[in-house]
Amino acid sequence: MNFTLNIRNVALFFTIVFSGFYLTRVLSLSPVYITFLIGSIVIVGYGIFNFSSIHISKASVIFLLYIVYILTTQPFLNPDFNTLINVLFSLFYFIIVINISLYSNNKILIRYSKYFIWFTIVLLAIESIWRITHPVFVIEGTNKDYRDTEGMLFYAYKFSSIMFKDSNFVGTYGLVAFFYYYYLKKNRYVKSNIPLIILFLLILLTLSRSAIITVPFTIFILYFLTLKIRLYHILIGVFILILIFIIVLPQIANDGSFLSKFNILELTWLHLQKCSLFEFFLGVGFGNTFKHIGIGAHNLFVTHLIESGVIGLLFFLSVNFSLIKHTRKNSLFLTIPLFISGMSLAGHAISFYYACLALIYVIQRNERKNISINSHL
């Protein structure tokens, strides 16, 4: 049993710490896929040799139903294969992490969480240094130069990421790490503020405006969720929102990227009006948004609506909202920032998000069952 437990802890270490280890611009196969394979082998192997004692988390059920829906509908929609794999991969990542974590106590989970945070800091620091020192001035597929267009120069420092297509996706990873540590700090599992400061600086270096803006917005929302709302809280909230609009709106009113978000919503509405009932309910296939509206969705909800249909969008929302009650609302530490930043960005490969969600679920479960120091095995 000790040998089995040690093997499981090794698998847990790899799946947690490297859950965001994407190097898509450097390697044909990112390390995160290898860690997923390790976790999968351990779960299957343990299930085979310890079938009588295997325990599957109830939280996995809705994820499994979502996966079944995807597997039974997407093959008929001719999806982009890599995009489909990333969606399934991220959902399966949650199932792997949660079902390995169930056999660990919070002492182990918090320790591995710290390793994850510090590994993320090192990885994002390396990514930032490389990207900023290797700007891409010429717009891909054209002869246009970012240096020749007013207000566009900063884009040159976003497209040479070693991790993803551009630094906006790096910003999402940074957001998840930031607010996962913020959750640990608020629940007094960790003490230091240093990782939060470093992660915020690294988010700034991504130059992702959606990620940067999401940080204060999420902290503001999380703060109000802890209060018994009174009239003066509402007045303060309204005042802050008005102040933000006064300061921010003039800066982005003529911004092409900002205006394109409204164009995407308009194109989505037109698509829904002319699409078939089949496409309305089941979607057009993951990765096919551009083929149908002429532009990438750049919106988490629009992406799932168009590509997996109304049913798929409901499943996506369900797997996220189903954890709120079981985690005593702590899953909102991650879901809120993902949804806010998702209004202008849609990433299919978010294994790090689901890994941290799984950890929050198990940590809160252990607290309820008073499994904080000793594992029940």
Regions found by a protein language model. Name each.
Residues 24-35, 73, 78-89, 165-170, ...:
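Helix-loop-helix junctions and helix-breaking kinks within/between transmembrane helices
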Residues 18-38, 54-57, 67-92, 105-109, ...:
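Interfacial transmembrane-helix termini
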Residues 252-308:
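Long extracytoplasmic/lumenal interhelical loops at the membrane interface
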Residues 51, 188-193, 216, 220, ...:
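Hydrophobic transmembrane alpha-helices and their immediate junctions
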Residues 114-141, 163-206, 213-224:
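Alpha-helical transmembrane segments of multi-pass inner-membrane proteins
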Residues 42-51, 70-129, 184, 222, ...:
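Transmembrane alpha-helical segments and their membrane-water interfaces
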Residues 71, 128-133, 206, 223-258, ...:
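A membrane-periplasm/extracellular boundary helix in multi-pass inner-membrane enzymes
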Residues 1-50, 66-77, 336-340, 352-359:
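N-terminal signal-anchor transmembrane segment
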